[in-house]
């Protein structure tokens, strides 16, 4: 578990801040946030005041005129069209938007999304051959196809194809009838940040302009959903689209989105980009990871309320299955890391038989959050391992894999994330090679994560008004991250664990006029380092907490540290006292870790500080007196073990470290 972070507070540029305050009339804290994001006056006007009328001409995209003519001709001749999508949320929403639009034009249109495990990402020849056999006249790809030169070449004489994609364009562009991708070298479209659904939406706009002379602005909520989920920069057109899409989502949303919001428990909330990223998108993604992404498309294209509700419930349940799969694999991976000892000091490489390949990427991300090392999670099936990688800031995981390419069957990706396959009997060799590579390329400081802080705030200045002012910068996302503030000194009035699994922490901070609530997700460890009366520094984002008609500011903790830590000192007599307390707290049966820790803090001897008392649990684990495990409900539990004979404290590394 990461205990420390590097706090990096942005420096001030008062001159630029004052210019923004004077020219744009913004609040000083908003001006500082804009300077931190390198937004000048001209960009600031577009950033704050940009509207749908500022969207770019879709015909500025290369090949758009060719694509429009071909689609129109195919519709007029009543020939069948197939939209070939992808199984992530960007692909799901792109498929949905284009399908809904072409249906409005009267097209004979269906869609095809490959199965994640058996077919993989992008175009595959077998699927295209099947579509040709069925008599498909035109295939329009969304969110894929730009790298499929050979596959397009194999079928281009037998079927018309339009490629719409947003991924980096290779040197060899597929020779389809039209290729719409703003990242092509000879495409002069000004905005290079569109998502896959954004490109598909531009095709819809071009077709509608040609037909009616008007802008097509339907389904912006679906476009916003995919844009946020694909983590593209929320600047330029993306910002305009997402801002308008969120307004639609909160006023008259797509039926499927409304039902998804309902089952996710967000129906009484104002939906933000954060809700999309952390709540709605995972439910759509779960279909592609666990079952099939076509169900998510069906949710977004149906006009039947009963069907939408049923599919939303199904996706919600699928997401729970995904979470359970993820939780189980994560627990096994953590055990693997612990068993590796020092082998995991530089890089995390874990593997398991038949781990679900649809969730190993998520598990890799969680392990990075937990241990902050370049991480590879590998699912082994029939002697072949399929791996997913996630990196840390400043370390190129693709280059690391490339240095080991002689060990791998195949690999691909980019600096932050990658995938690969490998013979299972070479995984240990890969771990050794990557360990050596990391020793040579990662400094000790780079293994400490950075929390980038926009500005310091005195604890007494935090109120709802400042949240309202800062909200002018929403929606947040890539290239416009949620502002992070810091309080450099505050006193803890209370601390408690919360949630069904007691895996989240709530800290109550004192202010001159009352208290502030601060929440730390997935940080139960804080209960052992921060206590009532502890003076802390806190890095956080801000949000409103609405409860029983009352609105108050709430801090979402990014990092929290005591300004001074209690020293851990242990004695034989003190441990005897703690043994009695823990034994009585356990009552001869399993108890949750949280309940036992609460009992320890309540009953500990007066001459022992909190950290020392809680550290006794670590010693009792090392001596085999108690055993930690995960209960059936996912909660961390302690089991009491009957140990015969006299206990030898010198066998406890923790006792030897802190004994006095």
Give each language-model segment a name.
Residues 98, 103, 239-334, 369, ...:
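Acidic, two-metal ion nucleic-acid-processing modules in DNA metabolism proteins
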Residues 131, 154-155, 620:
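Generic structural signal for hydrophobic
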Residues 2-3, 10-137, 158, 208-429, ...:
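Hydrophobic helix-and-loop "lid/oligomerization" segment in the mid-to-C-terminal part
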Residues 142-194:
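Histidine/acidic-residue-rich, glycine-tolerant segments that coordinate divalent metal ions
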Residues 97, 174-228:
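Short alpha-helices
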């Amino acid at each position: 578990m990461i205990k420390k972070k590097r706090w990096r507070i942005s420096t001030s540029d008062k001159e630029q801040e004052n210019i923004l305050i004077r020219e744009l009339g913004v609040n000083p804290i908003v001006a500082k946030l804009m300077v931190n994001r390198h937004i000048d006056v001209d960009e600031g006007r577009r950033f704050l005041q940009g509207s749908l009328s500022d969207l770019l001409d879709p015909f500025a995209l290369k090949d758009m005129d060719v694509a429009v003519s071909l689609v129109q001709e195919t519709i007029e001749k009543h020939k069948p069209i197939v939209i070939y999508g992808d199984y992530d949320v960007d692909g799901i929403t792109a498929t949905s938007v284009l399908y809904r639009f072409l249906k409005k034009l009267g097209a004979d249109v269906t869609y095809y999304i490959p199965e994640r495990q058996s077919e993989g990402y992008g175009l595959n020849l077998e699927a295209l051959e099947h579509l040709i056999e069925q008599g498909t006249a035109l295939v329009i790809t969304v969110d894929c196809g730009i790298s499929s030169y050979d596959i397009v070449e194999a079928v281009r004489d037998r079927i018309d194809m339009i490629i719409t994609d947003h991924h980096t364009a290779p040197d060899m562009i597929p020779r389809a009838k039209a290729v719409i991708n703003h990242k092509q070298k000879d495409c002069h479209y000004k905005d290079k940040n569109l998502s896959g659904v954004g490109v598909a939406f531009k095709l819809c706009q071009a077709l509608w302009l040609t037909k009616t002379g008007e802008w097509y602005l339907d389904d912006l909520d679906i476009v916003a959903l995919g844009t946020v989920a694909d983590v593209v920069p929320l600047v330029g057109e993306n910002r305009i689209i997402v801002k308008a899409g969120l307004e639609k989502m909160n006023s008259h949303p797509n039926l499927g989105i409304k039902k998804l919001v309902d089952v996710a428990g967000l129906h009484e909330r104002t939906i933000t980009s954060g809700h999309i990223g952390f709540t709605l998108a995972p439910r759509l993604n779960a279909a592609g990871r666990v079952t099939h992404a076509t169900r998510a498309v069906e949710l977004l294209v149906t006009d039947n309320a009963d069907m939408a509700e049923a599919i939303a419930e199904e996706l919600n349940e699928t997401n729970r299955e995904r979470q359970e799969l993820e939780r189980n694999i994560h627990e096994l991976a953590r055990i693997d890391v612990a068993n590796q000892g020092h082998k995991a000091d530089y890089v995390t490489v874990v593997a398991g038989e038949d781990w679900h390949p649809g969730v190993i990427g998520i598990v890799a991300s969680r392990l990075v959050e937990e241990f902050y090392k370049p991480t590879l999670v590998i699912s082994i099936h029939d002697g072949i391992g399929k791996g997913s990688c996630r990196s840390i800031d400043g370390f190129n995981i693709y280059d690391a894999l490339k240095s080991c390419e002689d060990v791998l069957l195949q690999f691909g990706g980019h600096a932050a994330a990658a995938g690969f396959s490998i013979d299972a009997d070479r995984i240990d060799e890969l771990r050794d090679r990557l360990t050596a590579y990391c020793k040579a390329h990662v400094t000790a400081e780079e293994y400490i994560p950075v929390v980038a802080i926009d500005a310091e705030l005195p604890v007494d200045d935090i109120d709802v008004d400042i949240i309202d002012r800062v909200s002018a910068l929403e929606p947040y996302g890539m290239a416009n991250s949620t502002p992070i503030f810091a309080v450099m000194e505050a006193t803890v009035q209370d601390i408690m664990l919360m949630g069904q699994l007691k895996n989240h922490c709530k800290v109550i901070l004192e202010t001159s006029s009352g208290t502030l609530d601060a929440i730390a997700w997935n940080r139960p460890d804080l209960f052992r380092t921060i206590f009532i009366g502890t003076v802390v520094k806190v890095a956080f984002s801000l949000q409103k907490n609405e409860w029983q008609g009352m609105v108050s500011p709430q801090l979402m903790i990014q990092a929290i540290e005591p300004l001074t830590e209690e020293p851990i000192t242990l004695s034989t007599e003190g441990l005897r006292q703690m043994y009695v307390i823990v034994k009585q707290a356990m009552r001869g049966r399993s108890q949750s870790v949280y309940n036992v820790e609460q009992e320890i803090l309540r009953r500990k001897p007066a001459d022992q500080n909190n950290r020392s008392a809680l550290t006794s649990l670590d010693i009792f684990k090392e001596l085999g007196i108690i055993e930690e495990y995960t209960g059936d409900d996912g909660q961390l539990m302690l089991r009491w073990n009957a140990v015969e004979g006299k206990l030898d404290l010198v066998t406890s590394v923790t006792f030897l470290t802190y004994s006095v």
